[in-house]
Amino acid sequence: MPIRIGFGPLILFVFSCIGIYLACGRHATTRMFAKKFYLFIVLYAVWSLGLILFRGEPFHDNRQIGYTLLITIFAFAGSGMVLIRDPLRAYVLGARVGTLLAVIIAVCLSIVDGGRIGIGGNQAVFAFVAGVAAISAAIPLRNTSRYLPNGPHWLVLGFAAVLTSETRAVIVVLPIFVAVEILIFLKRFSIRQQGAAYAILFAATAALVVVGPVGSIISKRFSGMVEYYDTGRAADWEDKISADIREVMWTSASRVIAAHPFTGVGSYSKMDFVEAEAGDKATMLNGFRHVHNTILDELLNDGIVGLIFMAGAFISIFVYLWRTADSWAMRRALIYFAVICGSYGMLHNPLLHEVTIASTMFFLAALNAAASRRMMAARRAGLISYIFGKKSAA
């Protein structure tokens, strides 16, 4: 199993073990959780691991086994976190501390060493984890610590950390989240105060873009691409090779999927199939373990059936958390999380790296545990259900 020792994933694993124990023991704290989510996750695990056994794939160096087990085990972390008095508060405060550390360390490394900042050399993974941490940190808390206050500044700090990775899939969406949260945050002030704040923000943004590092990073990662599509000159796009590789991978993967739609070809040998379809361009794909697109990767691994189980799991937990959210701020966080996962998943895959899997499941587990505790509190108050804006009396 490809597990890197990390404090966050280790904590999540402990909560997952507790959650599995409580679920197997049919403990009362787990009975009101999102049952459809767990059902689809278990079905996905059985299907994915069953296909691996059916195909006779080797266990050694088979990353799909590890990733499937991680997703399945971490799915039960919410059941373990429900034992914490306020799981959401603990998670959000931890995310705020993590965001602070991420931006400080990333900026320092960028200044001292230069280049793109990543986790284990993987810049995209760092960008995704920092982005999810910033979204989590921006969730408002009641009676929050004065040293870690509520506000949109957490998204700004997260964006600063993500910029050091120069990962386009995350850079393009975080500024939208920042703008929305700043607009909502400033509504509490007078029109005059809002005008002054907007003027300061506009001036600061312009300074960072024109004379600061933001402009150079954006120019480096986006300008060449825009100029290429405007002029057609490949020389204008410095890293066009990355787009060319993805085009070959995705085109070849689509042909493989068309030939094996229901069960896929398996993670262990999928790149062999893709390279065979690539023909004389196969050398461009040397060293790649997946096709850098969540949907295509899943269709290659487990086919349409596996994709249905996976999509069913994440759609069901999203709907459950949306219905049981206690504020519109929580719902916005869910939207931001879905958008960043979608944006990242189009060019990478958050479910094919142990760190991004842990980040994804930690977010869902914390919100899931908080929702369960709200539902249990509603039951104790004589209500039969808790849905945001609708509390049904017993």
What are these regions (language model features)?
Residues C24-R26, D280, N301-G342:
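Hydrophobic transmembrane alpha-helices and their immediate junctions
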Residues I11, M32-L49, E57-M81, V97-V103, ...:
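Aromatic-anchored transmembrane helix interface
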Residues M1-L53, F59, V82-R89, L93, ...:
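Transmembrane signal-anchor hairpin modules in multi-pass inner-membrane enzymes, especially those
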Residues C17, I135, A313, A329-G389, ...:
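Transmembrane alpha-helices of multi-pass inner-membrane enzymes
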Residues T164, F185-D236, T251-A259:
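A membrane-periplasm/extracellular boundary helix in multi-pass inner-membrane enzymes
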Residues F13-I20, V156, I171-L183, A358-A365:
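Hydrophobic transmembrane alpha-helices of multi-pass, membrane-embedded glycosylation machinery
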Residues I73-G114, I119-R188, V211-P213, V339:
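Alpha-helical transmembrane segments of multi-pass inner-membrane proteins
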Residues D236-T251, R255-A259, T263-D302:
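Long extracytoplasmic/lumenal interhelical loops at the membrane interface
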